[in-house]
C-alpha cells in the first residue's frame, strides 16, 4: 500500500472530518481500486453515532474534490477544491436555514499545516494550533487500519 492514494492524500480530508465530527468514530470502511497492489483510488466511509462522513482520494483518477459531512439534521458542504476554498455551507432540509460561512484564507490550506509543523519544530513540546495531538494520532491510526487491511474492500 505504500505510495498509494491513502498514504499520500488521506491526511487532507481526514482533518476536516475530525474537526467537524471528532475522532471517536464507530467504524470505517475503505473501498479501493488497486493497481499492482497500490491503491489508485480509495473511498472511505466513517460511521459515527449520529453522523456519517466519507472522502475519496486518488492518483491518476478524477473526482469532484468537494467535501460533504452528513449529519442527522443537515450536512456541511465544502465546494471543490475544498482544501483551497474560502467558504463552506451548512445545509438543511428546509433551505431557509441554510447558511454560508466565509473566512479569509491566504494561499492554499496546506500553508497552514506547514506553519504548524514549523512551529512544532521550533518550540519546546508538542504544539499545533490547528491540529490537535488527538487528531494527529487518529490520522495515523486510520492509516494503520488501512495498511493492515482492516475493512478494506478491493474493487
Model regions and ranges:
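C-terminal "lid/loop" region of Rossmann-like NAD(P)-dependent oxidoreductases
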Residues: 96-106
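Helix-loop-beta segment of a Rossmann-like dinucleotide-binding subdomain
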Residues: 1-5
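C-terminal helix-rich "cap/oligomerization" subdomain common to oxidoreductases
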Residues: 116-155
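Short polybasic amphipathic segments
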Residues: 67, 84-95
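Active-site substrate-recognition segment that forms the wall
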Residues: 109
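Contiguous beta-strand/loop segments that form the cofactor/metal-binding neighborhood of enzyme cores
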Residues: 8-84, 104, 114-126
Amino acid at each position: 500500500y505504500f505510495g498509494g492514494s491513502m498514504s499520500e492524500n488521506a491526511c487532507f480530508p481526514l482533518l476536516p472530518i475530525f474537526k467537524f465530527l471528532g475522532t471517536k468514530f464507530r467504524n470505517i470502511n475503505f473501498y479501493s481500486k488497486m493497481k499492482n497492489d497500490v491503491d489508485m483510488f480509495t473511498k472511505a466511509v466513517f460511521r459515527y453515532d449520529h453522523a456519517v462522513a466519507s472522502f475519496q482520494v486518488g492518483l491518476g483518477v478524477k473526482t469532484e474534490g468537494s467535501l460533504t459531512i452528513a449529519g442527522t439534521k443537515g450536512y456541511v458542504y465544502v465546494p471543490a477544491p475544498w482544501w483551497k476554498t474560502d467558504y463552506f455551507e451548512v445545509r438543511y432540509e428546509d433551505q431557509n436555514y441554510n447558511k454560508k460561512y466565509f473566512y479569509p484564507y491566504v494561499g492554499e490550506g496546506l500553508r497552514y499545516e506547514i506553519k504548524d509543523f514549523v512551529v512544532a519544530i521550533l518550540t519546546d513540546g508538542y504544539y499545533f494550533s490547528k491540529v490537535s495531538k488527538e487528531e494527529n494520532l487518529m490520522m495515523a491510526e486510520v492509516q494503520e487500519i488501512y495498511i493492515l487491511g482492516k475493512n478494506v474492500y478491493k474493487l
